[in-house]
A protein has these predicted regions:
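C-terminal polymerase-core module
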Residues: 556, 560-563, 567-619, 786-834, ...
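Extended two-metal-dependent nuclease catalytic cores across DNA- and RNA-processing enzymes
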Residues: 10, 20, 40-44, 93-272
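Conserved RNase H-like, two-metal-ion catalytic cores of nucleic-acid enzymes
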Residues: 23-24, 28, 34-73, 89-90, ...
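Active-site palm subdomain of RNA-directed nucleic acid polymerases
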Residues: 512-524, 528, 848, 852-873, ...
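Conserved "right-hand" nucleotidyltransferase catalytic core of DNA-directed polymerases
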Residues: 253-391, 411, 434, 477-677, ...
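Function-dense linear segments that define catalytic or interfacial modules
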Residues: 377-382, 446-476, 493-500, 654-738
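Active-site-proximal helix-loop-helix substrate-binding element of RNase H-like nuclease domains
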Residues: 172-200, 369-514, 524, 556, ...
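Conserved catalytic core of nucleic-acid polymerases
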Residues: 481-483, 537, 649-650, 654-657, ...
């Protein structure tokens, strides 16, 4: 029976044929290893590597679907010497150590198999191959059919008419499987399965370091065994063996050949304690898809596997207490009952708000926003979970008033800033902020690598609850649409969100306490939520007419550049097509280039920047790219974000970056270009209200000051204390040049070194940045560390601590996990070390600017000023102020920014004023 026959057996169910029972045996380490190397690296939101486990399960599920076995067992190797090592010390001696990412997944797959109730067998002193061989023989004697699943072709020796060896190949496109019984092995290799051992004895096996006979390769070994059937017969007729070298070596290395045969032979009677009843799938394959395994698949985020599990998420009693409230009397009683309790709340937005959320613009401030609620969901105990709907009796204004005036012990929100916007929160005084809890911000601090913190993820990670996600409940519909289609789904989604927020609060706070981040949460991150809410509400005025004029100006420049490029190329072509551009530059014009790849020539910026100084067409192309990006991203892109109040209300994201920095989206106002004049001019479209002006302050070299303070390097600290130009000072030290004689070029190079050190730059990176040799760049770095020795000590110690702990910390206790430090991939580890060097510096700087934002925002309110903080761009704060308040605001702004932190190095602030953002910057 061939492999194809094996897969195409047809049984007539009408015939009373008793089918043989079937045992599937899986070579655990082999399949895990094959899956690991066959799939790209995968990690879940916890940072766990999962590709090997995922691939293993995919292969196993495919086998189970095809085989539908009665028995199932997985064999694993034990990390200990076997009898083969005692026979031959160098056995498997050439194998590299297992990658750490793969090693971490061995206990994970064992946990998964155990959760599925699958029998696992290991035996010290023997390999998994010996276990598989022993069990296959026992099963065949018991009248079973056997399928052995392995990536190791050594197991082909086990194939019989009732034992099929199946070898999977894992690819991105899926899993392909080769099938071998006796006939298949003979057809493919020209020898029987048992003779396959003798082939290995002659040719050896480099993967297992089985020596074999020198000079005999796969082809010769196969031909000899096909003729003689065993190595003993080959040796007996050695004088007639061809070629002559094989004849000579089979005699000279005969003892080695015998040893190789013994090493290659799988033991069929290993002392394995095993009962078939332990591996019996009494409930069929379906019995493997247990709730425990389902939970692990959810944890590892194997979403496309979940449908296999005919189990529901673990039940909790919460859903039994979800109550929909539509009448005013009941709503009043619910809010009365909630008084003086810890209340989780979320505003379920009305239709117009939700529709605008899907169009890519910032929904909270678009023209279509209405103040209408669909509902408010609240939770204040395990039994008190309500979905209070607007309708004939309950109005949005009623709910709005309750959320703003209800006296509670504390307010809890799954996403506080979003919900403050949705019910248009009245001003919340600084003293009252501590009465609020933000689930999303707390979860972010605990694990800042995830980037998203929906209620179902928080429930899974911190409460052990497997809840359906918002997407699972609503799909592509909004709440209003789902209420019409399936009210229960909409209600369950909204209620589970507030239930999770309410239930997770003590757990998250305890976790923050254990991680020493409770102060960071209470004093910085939570107050910042309210500051960002106010800033987003304020927005920044954008002049649509000026924006169009700016776009028109760019269009003229782009057209002129196109003409220049076409003239230089001698023809018109698509400048935005890398393929066409590559042909023009490197074939038609003959510019020097790197080797052409399958996809064509590289026209990436780093490639073109090297050519630009010598070739004007390349410089024009780079400028063309800059201008077209400016036009599409800013001139054209920003106009869609101007709301009915004439302002752009960006979203300031608090829970996105791993380092703690804020980001800006919808639109991104932190990424306004500053290096080219045409890019900087975009700031001219941003204006204060008539009669007002902008005050703009930014920290001077904040990250270098933080580096000096954290490292305690006296020389750098002294330079800052003396008010020296730090880059000129560094140039003087590194290039051994008197301070007053430092050239502009030396200062520029020193500046690159200063900021490069902050980001853990290598000699290779610095050489590219400065256009110098790697040796010269390394000399700069070495000289830098000689002059600033404590910086070197600090960076080295930071990396060591990060490797030990798995994370870095800022001055204020912010943790940044760095899983890359444990990678078996050298480049990933190098990246992890650079992250470790930079994170405490960049993270501390981010903490400082956040503290400054809170201080400035609160002082403006405390002083009763009309001026407002409206924008933050990394180390820069922008205030819109009245002319009469200008002087007071400047003093206030600089004082609060300088006073944000007490370090060995003072924070210096530069301030400018102007009637548009360009002039103020």
């Amino acid at each position: 029976m061939t492999g194809s026959d094996y897969n195409n057996i047809i049984i007539d169910s009408k015939e009373s044929i008793k089918m043989s029972e079937k045992l599937v045996l899986i070579d655990g380490h082999s399949i895990l290893n094959r899956a690991y190397h066959g799939l790209p690296d995968l990690t879940n939101s916890e940072g766990l590597h999962t590709n090997a486990v995922y691939g293993f399960l995919n292969i196993m599920f495919k086998i189970l679907d095809e085989e539908k076995p009665d028995y199932l067992t997985v064999a694993f190797d034990v990390h200990a010497p076997t009898f083969r090592h005692r026979m031959f010390d160098a056995y498997k001696g050439t194998r590299k150590p297992m990658d750490e990412e793969l090693r971490q997944q061995v206990p994970m797959i064992k946990e998964m198999l155990t959760a599925m109730g699958i029998k696992i067998v290991e035996k010290e002193g023997y390999e998994a191959d010996d276990i598989l061989g022993t069990l296959s023989v026992r099963a065949e004697k018991a009248g079973m059919d056997v399928a052995i699943i392995s990536g190791d072709r050594d197991l082909l020796q086990l194939a019989t008419d009732h034992v099929m060896v199946r070898i999977p190949k894992t690819k991105k496109t899926g899993t392909e499987i080769e099938n071998y019984n006796t006939a298949d092995v003979i057809e493919k290799y020209g020898v029987t399965p048992k003779e396959f051992i003798d082939v290995k004895a002659l040719q050896g096996d480099t993967s297992d370091n089985i020596p074999g006979v020198p000079g005999i390769g796969e082809k010769t070994a196969g031909a000899l065994i096909a003729k003689y059937h065993c190595i003993e017969a080959v040796h007996e007729d050695a004088e007639n063996v061809k070629p002559p070298r094989a004849s000579k070596n089979i005699v000279e290395y005969w003892e080695q050949a015998l040893m190789s045969k013994e090493l290659a032979t799988i033991i069929l009677d290993a002392p394995v304690d095993y009962e078939f009843s332990d591996a019996k799938l009494s409930g069929g394959v379906e019995s493997l898809y247990t709730e425990e395994a389902f939970l692990l698949c959810k944890r590892y985020e194997f979403k496309n596997m979940l449908s296999r599990f005919n189990v529901e998420a673990p039940k909790n009693n919460a859903e039994e207490h979800f109550v929909v409230v539509r009448d005013l009397k009941t709503a009043e009683s619910v809010f009365e009952k909630a008084k003086d309790r810890e209340v989780a709340f979320a505003v379920v937005p009305g239709e117009s708000l939700e529709n605008s959320e899907s169009d890519g613009q910032l929904s909270l401030f678009s023209e279509q926003v209405s103040n209408d609620y669909l509902a408010v969901s609240i939770c204040f105990s395990e039994e008190d979970i309500y979905f209070i709907c607007t309708g004939d009796e309950i109005s949005s204004s009623f709910l709005d008033e309750k959320l703003n005036t209800l006296e509670v012990k504390s307010w809890i929100s799954p996403d506080l800033k979003t919900n403050l916007h949705r019910f248009k929160s009245k001003e919340i005084k600084a003293d009252d902020r501590g009465r609020y809890f933000d689930m999303m911000v707390a979860a972010y601090l605990i694990n800042p690598l995830v980037g998203e913190y929906p209620y179902d993820a928080v429930a899974k990670d911190y409460l052990g609850l497997m809840l359906s996600s918002k997407k699972d409940y609503l799909g592509k519909l909004d709440f209003t649409q789902m209420m019409k289609e399936d009210e229960k789904k909409a209600v369950d989604c909204a209620c589970y969100e507030v239930y999770t927020a309410w239930k997770s609060k003590p757990v998250l706070l305890q976790k923050l306490k254990e991680m020493n981040m409770l102060t960071l949460y209470r004093d910085i991150e939570l107050p910042l939520v309210f500051v960002l809410y106010d800033m987003e509400n304020e927005g920044i005025r954008a002049d649509g007419i000026k924006l169009k004029e700016y776009g028109d100006k760019l269009a003229v420049s782009i057209t002129e550049l196109e003409k220049k490029i076409y003239e230089a190329a001698g023809e018109e072509f698509n400048i935005n097509s890398p393929k066409q551009l590559g042909v023009i530059l490197f074939e038609k014009l003959g510019l020097p280039n790197e080797k052409k790849t399958k996809t064509g020539y590289s026209t990436a910026a780093d490639v073109l920047e090297k050519l630009a100084p010598e070739y004007p067409i390349v410089a024009d192309i780079l400028e063309y790219r800059q201008l077209t990006k400016l036009k599409s991203t800013y001139a054209d892109g920003l106009s869609g974000y101007i709301a009915s109040d004439g302002k752009i209300h960006t979203t300031l994201n608090q829970t996105i970056t791993a380092t703690g920095r804020l980001s800006s989206t919808e639109p991104n106002l932190q990424n306004i270009p500053i290096r080219i004049e045409l890019g900087k001019l975009i700031r001219k479209v941003f204006l204060p209200e008539d009669g007002d002006l902008f005050v703009d302050s930014d920290y001077s070299q904040i990250e270098l000051r933080v580096l000096a303070a954290l490292s305690g390097d006296e020389r750098m600290i002294e330079a800052f204390k003396n008010g020296q130009d730090i880059h000129r000072s560094t140039a003087s030290l590194v290039f051994d040049t008197p301070f007053d004689e430092v050239t502009d070029l030396q200062r520029r190079n020193a500046k690159a070194v200063n900021f490069g050190i902050v980001y853990g730059i290598s000699a290779f990176g610095l050489s590219n940045d400065l256009g110098i040799s790697r040796k010269e760049a390394q000399g700069y770095i070495d000289s830098y560390f000689v002059k600033y020795p404590k910086i070197k000590e600090f960076l080295d110690q930071t990396v060591l601590d990060a490797k030990k702990n798995g994370y870095t910390k800022t001055m204020f206790g912010r943790i940044r996990p760095i899983p890359e430090l444990n990678s078996s991939n050298f480049m990933q580890r190098q990246f992890g070390e650079r992250v470790a060097m930079n994170s405490p510096i960049q993270g501390t700087a981010a903490d400082i600017i956040k503290i400054a934002m809170i201080r400035v925002h609160d002082r403006l309110l405390d002083e009763g000023l009309k001026s407002r903080l409206i924008l933050q761009v990394h180390d820069e704060l922008l205030i819109e102020t009245k002319e009469a308040e200008k002087d007071k605001v400047i003093k206030l702004l600089e004082k609060e920014m300088r006073g944000a932190v007490d370090m060995k190095v003072s924070m210096e602030v530069g301030t400018e004023c102007g009637y548009d953002w360009y002039d103020a910057h």
